[in-house]
Amino acid sequence: MVVNIERLFSKRANRLRSSEIRELLKLTQMPGMISFAGGLPNPKAFPVEIIHKCIDDTFKKNSETALQYGTTEGVAKLRRVLAERMRKTRDIDCELHDLIITSGAQQALSLAALIFIDPGDTYLTSVPAYLGAVQAFHAYEANCESIPMDEEGIDTDSLR
């Protein structure tokens, strides 16, 4: 028996389309392909030895908890250190509850869209724009208004 699970999807999920970024990244897997796209650092630049040392140290000191799930907002110790750094180096009054650790910019953009965008809201973006942000905002049914750029950045005259 074949079950059509897509009929159970939410309206929002049915509006989603395949990620253009994901499709482009598939091309980077082709043999001999040299990608000049952003977001794919040169693997030779990775500090592999330092990462190995950090992993070894972590397992020596915290072997029972190193692979456990953490809190949704991120490890409290890391958030405390970052809050203190914000206070000391940037004079920003920052507390533990003011910070959330994400796995990257895309997760942060998706969370921001979830919190701030209602269906039908309009957001402004430069042209060109980060495709991942446009897709995250589109998923929450926002309307995009593009603003042209000139040699100094966003063309503010076009906002009038």
Give the residues covered by each predicted segment.
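Generic N-terminal amphipathic, Lys/Arg-enriched alpha-helix
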Residues: 2-12
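Amphipathic coiled-coil/heptad-repeat helices and related helical stalk/stem segments
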Residues: 17-21, 105, 109, 130, ...
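PLP-dependent aminotransferase-like
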Residues: 117-160
